[in-house]
Amino acid sequence: METQNKHEIVDSVEKLEALLARVREAEKIFATYSQEQVDKIFKAAAIAANKARIPLAKMAVEETGMGVVEDKIIKNHYAAEYIYNAYKNTKTCGVIEEDSAFGMKKVAEPIGVVAAVIPTTNPTSTAIFKTLICLKTRNGIIISPHPRAKKSTIEAAKIVLEAAVKAGAPEGIIGWIDVPSLDMTNLLMQEADIILATGGPGMVKAAYSSGKPALGVGPGNTPAIIDDTADIVLAVNSIIHSKTFDNGMICASEQSCIVHEKIYKKVKDEFLYRGCYFLKKDELDKVRKTIIINGALNAKIVGQPAYKIAALAGVTIPETTKVLIGEVESVDISEEFAHEKLSPVLAMYKAKDFEDALSKAEHLIACLLYTSPSPRDRSVSR
């Protein structure tokens, strides 16, 4: 499913500078549009993106070799239909708020050109989301795709652009880099008016260091505490669902599970019952060496099913295995299982009590708590 590419191939700094100029001109025209015109464009683009959710998902998985088609369909659907419904009635043009008592008015104006850095983990859904919110706010946007996901990312952008232009948007309001590189991305971030950066820690840091306003979405490392008052079946099922959705590539998915020692065996048995695999000691060391290589997450495990990750480590497990679980003790950076893994690999810790569990979670990042109503939810909030 390829749309017609009517723009000049952007594969050099000179062509990127020309693209920036074209998008700026289109944005100046778009800035004059009324709310009614903008909403018509926003709706048409969202409908087009949603209609393409299935082929875009297939294209993303085929190109990147990561994730699950069915789950990427859901993500594309969410990025298109949910985002549209969430913002369709939001005023983004002209006076959006007025206080006659104080003689104040709040006026919405576009920022200009948005630099949108797109990750390989969620290429099409992220491109859909960022292009739609730029259309809703009358901003121009230039997409910098990940080299491993450029085909699917650009295709998503084309679909949104063509629908938007057909509905009345200026030609060239959405642009993209056809041959992405670090130099091109850095130039785009320096020249744009604001940056929406989604990616690894290095990319997000570069966005924040560019000298331009930036909103970064970087790595997560969410631990989950399963308290002794928790509904064990619910907690375990929720974690498995999170870790297997798109093969664990959602940054908010649990990376570690911290279990109260009173229910540790019951929780472990529930994971086993639901098709997870607990690594033996020698297997644990093999998988450790596969998770982190040269101080960074091994790209070969990202978005892969559990059995393939085990095979990379030289461990044989059933192909039906849902999640690889490593029982570990250290929450220090030296423990590979304590890192974000972006795959169906989970660290599992035993806690002596709730305070010990909370302490471990704080060392990792924050925490998600499975508990029955109790004073403990208040101690987490503190």
Could you tell me what each predicted segment is?
Residues R138, I195, H260, I309, ...:
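Residue-level signal for inorganic ion chemistry
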Residues E25-T32, A115-A116, S256-V259, L342-K352, ...:
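Short, well-ordered beta-strand elements within core beta-sheets of diverse protein domains
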Residues V10-V13, V204-D332, S359:
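ALDH superfamily catalytic-core signature
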Residues V95-L234:
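Rossmann-like NAD(P) dinucleotide-binding subdomain of oxidoreductase/dehydrogenase enzymes
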Residues M1-K105, I133, Y273:
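N-terminal Rossmann-like NAD(P)+-binding subdomain of aldehyde/semialdehyde dehydrogenases
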Residues Y370-S381:
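Single conserved hydrophobic/aromatic residue that forms the stacking wall/gate
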Residues L358, E362-S372:
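Hydrophobic alpha-helical bundle architecture
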Residues A338-V345, I365-L369:
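Conserved glycine-rich beta-strand-loop-beta hairpin in the small C-terminal domain of fold type I
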